[in-house]
Amino acid sequence: MWSDIETSKDLLGYSIHASLLKDVITNPKNLPITVGLYGDWGSGKSSILKILQEQLEKDDDTVVVYFDGWSFENFDDAKMALIQGIVDALESNEKFFAKVKDDAKGAMDAVTEAFVKLKKSINWMRMLKFTTKAALPVASAVISGGASIIPTLISVFQENKEHLTDILTGDKAEEFLQNAINSEDNEKKYKAVREFRTDFEALINKSKQGRIVILIDDLDRCLPRHIIDNLEAIKLFLNVPKTAFVIAADQYIVSNAIKSEYKTIIEASKEDRHHDNLGEAYMEKFIQLPYILPKLSPKEVETYVTLLFCQSALNEQDFFKSTKRFHLICE
């Protein structure tokens, strides 16, 4: 019986996918970027992330952090949990400090102080109750464009929701959004988002690292609301220069989760010819590069099973030779 967990041992020739993704996210011209690694459950997404992680960790200019999206499932405030988790992971990552630890004492202190400031910002945002549905959509609209959060805004501003899409995509979009953030409460939240983004970008620059890569697995196993929360947290708070996110998920499950979360909106806008594609359109606003894994052919499945039997029958040295020959043949 074989283990049903991810592995960095490449028996399927998936290193080519990891290498292609590495080339994309290590190119400074492409950053910031969010990549969607799409495939069915059991298609090998998690293994590709592990292989990619190993490749990236060999790069002196890259700090990589791996997250299981499901690990935040028990938190009510999924947005803040993800942000806190990423900040904590960077703070505990020795490589993040590697380029400043031998510099003058001031450089190391600057990074440490930046972490303290970010943590205070997170606590402040928790106090502002960013879990409420109005604040983040409005701030997101101003930062990343109104159309990207139309579904959320419709769920918040129930009045005139039939006309909200037209308002946000028309000539009066800027005026509408500005009026929406003019309340004192939303003004504080909008300012907090801006300050966090500025401080997070400053932290990365002070570390002197070339890029920060966040690998997020199993997003599609989260509850629909948490799937959306995680995507919005990445786009709104963390998508700053020198960052790359690779999110492994079944795109159809994520899309259906979005449709499920906003099913009342879809019902209310049936006359809109775009409502059937709401899930896909919503995802496109967060994912710049969709990378879809091809399904295995029967021949590839046969080869994989053969290699599994070889792995169980051969010692480690002989099996390594066998897989090396296999990869040479594939090339």
Feature map (PLM): residue ranges:
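Short secondary-structure boundary/capping segments
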Residues: L52, A81-I86, D229-L231, S260-E267, ...
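Conserved Walker B catalytic segment
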Residues: N186-R194, T198-N256, E261-K263
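Short regulatory helix/loop adjacent to the ATP-binding pocket of P-loop NTPases
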Residues: V254-K285
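Conserved AAA+ ATPase small/helical "lid" subdomain
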Residues: D103-T132, M283-E331
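Conserved nucleotide-binding/hydrolysis micro-motifs of P-loop NTPases
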Residues: W41-S43, S71-F75, D250-S255, K263, ...
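Short glycine-/polar-rich loops that comprise or flank the Walker A/P-loop
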Residues: P32, D60-V63, G210, V240-A244, ...
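P-loop NTPase nucleotide-binding core
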Residues: L56-E201, K206, K270-E271, L314-E316
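Walker A/P-loop-proximal flanking segment of P-loop NTPase domains
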Residues: M1-M80, Q84-D88, L203, L289, ...
